[in-house]
């Protein structure tokens, strides 16, 4: 279940930035991800992917959404089993890196992207960067 309008307004996030995305997974399942997205001003806007750690979630990045220039598209997902994303149970490091690939594919995001990460989101960002050096 996604956050309520009131929860979003309490942290200064416009409700239209919050969505639930159905993501086909590399494991054959489809998972519901909660994602905060601020669109860029153009279709070709640079993309900043914000990966939280534990025990936080996408709301950690709400201030950054207001600080970065409006011509940047910002995406901050709740990892699976965290925040408002679907609870899938334990997931390995390798699986979580593939989960990020699945999400970006579902959002039609191509490289290059910038990644901002916190806590073990940094380890996931490194895993993604190793698999996608461009």
Predicted features, each with a name:
Residues 37-84:
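Conserved HGGG/HGGXW glycine-rich cap/lid loop of the alpha/beta-hydrolase fold
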Residues 65-68, 91-93, 133:
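Glycine-rich, phosphate-binding/catalytic loops in enzymes
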Residues 111-134:
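Conserved hydrolase catalytic core segment
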């Amino acid at each position: 279940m996604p956050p309520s309008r009131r929860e979003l307004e309490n942290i200064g996030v416009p409700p239209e930035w919050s969505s639930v995305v159905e993501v086909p997974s590399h494991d054959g399942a489809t998972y519901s991800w909660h994602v905060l997205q601020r669109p860029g001003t153009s279709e070709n806007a640079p993309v900043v992917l914000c990966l939280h750690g534990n025990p936080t979630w996408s709301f950690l990045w709400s201030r950054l959404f207001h600080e970065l220039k409006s011509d940047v598209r910002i995406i901050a997902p709740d990892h699976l089993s965290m925040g408002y994303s679907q609870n899938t149970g334990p997931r390995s490091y390798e699986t979580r890196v593939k989960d990020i690939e699945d999400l970006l594919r579902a959002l039609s995001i191509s490289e290059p992207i910038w990644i901002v990460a916190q806590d073990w989101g940094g380890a996931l960002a490194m895993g993604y960067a190793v698999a996608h050096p461009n």
